[in-house]
């Protein structure tokens, strides 16, 4: 280890000893001594002291040439002449006491940083305030008075002038400090605390004003945006949601007089209708405000084409009469958007019946027209095949159970005998099963096939021929062209029917459950003749 440290420093003061250890083939001259640096000389002296004598703090910390010469076992005569050590000067002080280049040209070393004391800096600042460019005589006087070297004083003045120029060139406006400004003066003295407090106060006030302005702007934007959104979205919500279908507020029940007011109301013609099973969704023809966007509470009652005027005034939805006078809340307002309840799309049949105050589910539709072919977009998916969207004819009055077209002549009443109805309802088709085109009135009669009764059938068909309209025209319905029955008598089934009024769309049931066409949804409600 020690030999390795000795090999790292093959310097001149160890010429004799290193020559014996390493065996250099040439002697070391004086020019090798001039290449030494100060820190290398210190480390070499410490290594030599550690190799010759036991470790000691003095041997490790001594940095002078005299200590190195005393610790070397075989000193060479080159050492005192090389470093020029007379014992009175020590060139390795932290604060420069002289210029080593002038006093000892043989010992070239790296100059350490000069540490100025506080009173030295004060004297230098006073001299700088008097003159930025002192002459050589003034610098010499400062160096003698401050125990410094004239070259250090000259370098300090150069740095001080550069700092002063930089500060002068980078001055900004009155409110913005320079990028290199600190709360100290150029001489390192602390700034006036009042000045620092004033600058900090200005900075805080400026930041506070900026924050208040930003907060006020955000509040004004927040106040303006919901109002404008609700104003602009009110008509669009009317057109998009039929009768407030998107609003989370539950619909209010209609007044009790609305149920029995008009011919198209719920309670007028429901007595003979069969209730819809609770498991099936309601047909689009029922009184659901979602399927009829043209009947809106906000737009008023708009008369429809091809319908009597009295049908348009009838409230269709449960909350139509209640919401007609009240301003509808926008579905995009802050209250409706933040409410936890989901938007009510469509009421279930049980809920609709309970809301309307009915003891059973309404089966007859209130508005028979559907959205197909009217140019509207379907807001909700169709839950039934298109073949079973069967609108029913609304009853004209609640007094008479029988439906008669307005333009047809009065027909003689049908015989009320149950055998005649049974034989008419069970007239066999071509395959021997019950004919769906002539299925009538009550399901128990249809379900029990019996032998045909030609006499009663002839009476009924003769009465229908006299009236000039088919049997289906008596009840206000149009049956599809069915297969001709066995040749008993010419029936007006395949022939042209008397058209129903436009206000009463016709319907006829599909195949019966017992027929060969397979299972199908329940057919449209029929009105009993009795």
Swiss-Prot record:
GO terms for cellular component: nucleus. It comes from Mus musculus. Residues 230-240, 433-448, 462-474 have a biased composition (Low complexity). GO terms for biological process: cartilage condensation; common myeloid progenitor cell proliferation; dorsal spinal cord development; olfactory bulb interneuron differentiation; pattern specification process; regulation of cell differentiation; regulation of gene expression. The keyword Ribosomal protein does not apply. Coiled coil: none annotated. InterPro entries: HD (IPR001356), Homeobox_CS (IPR017970), Homeodomain-like_sf (IPR009057). Keywords: Developmental protein, Differentiation, DNA-binding, Homeobox, Neurogenesis, Nucleus, Transcription, Transcription regulation. This is Homeobox protein unc-4 homolog. GO terms for molecular function: DNA-binding transcription factor activity, RNA polymerase II-specific; sequence-specific double-stranded DNA binding. It is found in: Nucleus. Belongs to the paired homeobox family. Unc-4 subfamily. Disruption phenotype: Mice die perinatally and exhibit severe malformations of the axial skeleton. Pedicles of the neural arches and proximal ribs are not formed. In addition, dorsal root ganglia are disorganized. In the hypothalamo-neurohypophysial system, neurons are viable and able to express neuropeptides; however, the connectivity of magnocellular neurons with posterior pituitary elements is compromised. Residues 206-224 have a biased composition (Basic residues). Expressed in the paraxial mesoderm, in the developing kidney and central nervous system. In the somite, it is restricted to the caudal half of the newly formed somite and sclerotome. In the central nervous system, it is detected in the developing spinal cord, hindbrain, mesencephalon and telencephalon. Expressed in adult and embryonic magnocellular neurons of the hypothalamo-neurohypophysial system. Residues 109-168 bind DNA.
């Amino acid at each position: 280890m020690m030999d390795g440290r000795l090999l790292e420093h093959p310097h001149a003061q160890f010429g004799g000893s290193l020559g014996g250890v390493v065996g250099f083939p040439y002697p070391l001259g004086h020019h090798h001594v001039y290449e030494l640096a100060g820190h290398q000389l210190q480390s070499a002296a410490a290594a030599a002291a550690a190799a010759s004598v036991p470790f000691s703090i003095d041997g490790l910390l001594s940095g002078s040439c005299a200590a190195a010469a005393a610790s070397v076992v075989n000193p060479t005569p080159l050492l005192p002449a090389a470093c020029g050590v007379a014992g009175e000067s020590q060139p390795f002080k932290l604060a420069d006491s002289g210029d080593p280049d002038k006093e000892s040209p043989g010992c070239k070393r790296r100059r350490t940083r000069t540490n100025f004391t506080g009173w030295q800096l004060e004297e230098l600042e006073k001299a700088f305030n008097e003159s930025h460019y002192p002459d050589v005589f003034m610098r010499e006087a400062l160096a003698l008075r401050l125990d410094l070297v004239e070259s250090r004083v000259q370098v300090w003045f150069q740095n001080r002038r550069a700092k002063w120029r930089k500060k002068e060139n980078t001055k900004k406006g009155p409110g913005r400090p320079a990028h290199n400004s600190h709360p100290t003066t150029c001489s390192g003295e602390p700034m006036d605390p009042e000045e620092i407090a004033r600058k900090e106060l200005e900075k805080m006030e400026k930041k506070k004003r900026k924050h208040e302005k930003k907060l006020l702007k955000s509040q004004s934007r927040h106040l303006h945006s919901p109002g404008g959104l609700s104003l602009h979205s009110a008509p669009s919500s009317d057109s998009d949601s039929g009768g407030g279908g998107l609003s989370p507020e539950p619909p209010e029940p209609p007044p009790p007089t609305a149920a029995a007011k008009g011919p198209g109301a719920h309670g007028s013609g429901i007595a003979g209708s069969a209730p819809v099973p609770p498991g099936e969704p309601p047909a689009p023809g029922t009184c659901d405000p979602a399927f009829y966007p043209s009947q809106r509470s906000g737009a008023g009652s708009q008369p429809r084409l091809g319908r009597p005027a009295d049908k348009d005034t009838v409230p269709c939805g449960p909350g139509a009469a209640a919401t007609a006078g009240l301003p509808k809340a926008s579905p995009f307002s802050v209250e409706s958007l933040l409410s936890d309840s989901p938007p009510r799309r469509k009421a279930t049949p049980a809920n609709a019946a309970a809301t309307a105050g009915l003891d059973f589910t309404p089966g007859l539709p209130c508005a028979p027209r559907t959205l197909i072919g009217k140019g509207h977009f379907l807001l909700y998916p169709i839950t039934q095949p298109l073949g079973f969207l069967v609108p029913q004819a609304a009853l004209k009055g609640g007094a008479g159970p029988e439906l008669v077209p307005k333009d047809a002549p009065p027909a003689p009443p049908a015989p009320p005998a149950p055998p005649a109805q049974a034989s008419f309802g069970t007239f066999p088709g071509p395959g021997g099963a019950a004919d769906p085109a002539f299925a009538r009135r009550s399901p128990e009669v249809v379900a029990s096939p019996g032998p045909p009764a030609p006499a009663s059938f002839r009476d009924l068909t003769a009465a229908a021929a006299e009236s000039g309209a088919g049997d289906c025209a008596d009840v206000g319905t149009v049956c599809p062209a069915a297969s001709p029955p066995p040749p008993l008598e010419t029936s007006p089934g395949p022939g042209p029917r008397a058209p129903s009024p436009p206000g009463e769309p016709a319907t006829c049931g599909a195949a019966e459950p017992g027929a060969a066409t397979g299972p199908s949804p329940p057919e449209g409600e029929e009105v009993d003749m009795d």
